[in-house]
Amino acid sequence: MMILAGLAFLLATFQTVADPGDPVFGQGDRIAIVGNTFAERMQLDGQFESLLHAAHPGHRLSIRNFGWSGDEVSLQPRPLNFIGMKEWLSNHETDVIIACFGMNESYSGDDGLDGFSRDLDAWITTQRANTYNGSTPPRIILVSPIAHEDLGEPLPDGVEHNFILQRYVDAMRRAAVSHDLVFIDLFTPTREAMDRGEGPLTINGIHPNASGYRLAACSMAEQLDLLGRLGNDSLDGDAVQDQESQAAVRRAVLAKNQLFFQRWRPVNTEYVYGRRHEPYGSQNFPDEMKKLDELVSEADQVIWSLPPGDVTCEIQEEDY
């Protein structure tokens, strides 16, 4: 309960950094989450996606997670012949990109900061030169790294790393201002929560647990100006039913994410894309991939059919 109490304090006091102005997400938007381990593990948590659906009932948002642990803004290794990100974003007809970078890059320290800024600028320029949805450049939301939590020995305490992380977060903020993008600062609210002794919020100092993802999801929603759509925070009457409805949405989101992960990152890419694609993969896998596409689309329909509930951002207590 201490985490939830601190979360309420955070949402009451934290000054939003992003100024999205007009609503960021529109009817039927197709959203892509890209980036590092933080982005990839969002698919196992589902809280931010659930909040997006709750804040946009009837919008039929279609969200795909393309996060890949270890990805950097300029370094994204893939298996042999793996489909490039541009093709994936085009296949999804992406309207909005939520990009989570900066944590991996921060380990290059001050020496890597200028290069990161240049690479991020180039990445933004490249994305905006594309029309993945067939008509307009994608709207881009930059999401900063969280702070480094001190979990005690044998893990690093993160004191020096946080000084460096702050510089990388500032570089991302400058890039967002330069390109007129929405910027979400997760470093400040997570560091403030850690300084207040809430937690643990991570499993190893830098990768969130369920409580950390709850804090991140609520902070992202707050900075995107979505919380006004999410109702009251009471735990009686309709609010209980609303939380149950939101839990059902989250379960449907997690089921969809699992199906899409099997489509986007099949277990044996050597047969799907690689050196054993011929003669075996070319015979078996195209039909399997088509079927998975159909199942993922059906999973979207399930999410859209559920009442989102008028909920608080405190979605779940349990860890995973």
Model-derived regions, located:
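Solvent-exposed loop/turn segments at secondary-structure junctions
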Residues: 37-41, 68-74, 96, 103-108, ...
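Oxyanion-hole/transition-state-stabilizing segment in secreted/luminal serine hydrolases
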Residues: 34, 46, 78-118, 148, ...
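Stable alpha-helical elements in mature extracytoplasmic
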Residues: 44, 48, 81, 85, ...
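Active-site segments of SGNH/GDSL-like serine hydrolases
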Residues: 100-104, 127-165, 237-238
